[in-house]
Amino acid sequence: MKDFVNQYDTGHITDRLYVHWDVSTQCQFKCTYCYAMKEYNWESNDAPGDWNKIDSWDRQKLVIGAISRSSLPIFLGLQGGEPTIHPKYDMLISKCHEAISKHEEGRLYVTTNGLRGPAFFESKPYYDKLMFLWSFHTEYADRYGNGS
């Protein structure tokens, strides 16, 4: 238990800003327990409401610009939906990495369902500088491992 408590001891941490950004509601899955589907008014397969949408790239660049102007180090988390199917994923990662790198303590992470597989991630910009959070979806367990 002591190791667990030490892991979350915040006495050494400088002030920072945590940003959890739903960059898209697009996803390869439609999990029955997905908070985002409910939050973005998913109604049915035929009437998706705001589900499976993405803001314009110009609007997203404005968000990234605002993040880059922070006077505090940023911990920026890209989530959704599934960020890796963003149509400009490589550019998104590059611009976000540039924005958080203004401060040495800045961090960028991607929350992913992991469906795309290791080769996808390893081929992307800043792979060695990103953190990945993987959420496994048991409803779609049969789709993992094919690298789609």
Sequence positions of predicted segments:
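Canonical Radical SAM [4Fe-4S] cluster-binding loop centered on the CxxxCxxC motif
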Residues: Q7-W57
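Short acidic donor-binding/metal-coordinating loop in glycosyltransferase active sites
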Residues: V23, G80-G81
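Conserved non-cysteine loop/helix-boundary elements of the Radical SAM core domain that shape
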Residues: E39-D55, G81-P87, H137-S148
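Radical SAM/AdoMet-radical enzyme domain recognition
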Residues: K61-G77, H86-S148
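Conserved Rossmann-like nucleotide-binding pocket used by diverse enzymes
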Residues: V19, G77-Q79
